[in-house]
Amino acid sequence: YLHILAGLLKPKTGEIEIDKTDIVSLSEKATDKFRGKHIGVVFQKSHFIGALTVLENLEMASWLATGKKHTKRAKKLLEQLGIENQASKLPSQLSIGQQQRVSIARALMNEPKVLLADEPTSSLDDKNAEKVIELLTSLSKEYKAALLIVTHDNRIKEKFINKITLV
């Protein structure tokens, strides 16, 4: 379902309206552009451009959506997530937990209207899981973004008032 909400897959029927735009009715190119500007996605398994540094991966996400690198924003997000000292490294040089935090920074780069997170704390220790949830919730409030988290992580389930449980 997260892939449908992100506009990566099209539903067979229905609409998905984000910021007064039905993304189902958009062309593939327009959907990609819309997603870049309005939807932040944190996948369970991180995906990066391996030849680019951590900082360059964040700048690329911003540049593809806006035509600007927003280096200052990228550095601020890395600092907020406690990985500012990893900015010049390649993603493959990071631990799985560090890669997950870079994925979260990338999802937040363009101040999305909707933030979708698939198991954002699955690779993190307790301290960093807490940091990530605080950052996701505070920034989603700051940007007035809807936040949808899919998780099995009992450490964070109770931190949210609104929950949907599927069995």
Q: How would you name each of these model-derived features?
A:
Residues A6:
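Helix-to-loop junction immediately C-terminal to a conserved catalytic motif
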Residues G14-D22:
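Conserved ABC transporter NBD signature motif
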Residues L52-E59:
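Short coil-to-helix segment of the ABC ATPase nucleotide-binding domain corresponding to the Q-loop/switch region
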Residues L90-Q100:
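Conserved ABC ATPase signature
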Residues I104:
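Hydrophobic anchor residue at the start of the ABC signature
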Residues M109-K113:
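A short, proline-enriched helix->beta-strand linker immediately N-terminal to the Walker B motif
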Residues L115-D118:
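Catalytic Walker B motif of ABC-type/P-loop ATPase nucleotide-binding domains
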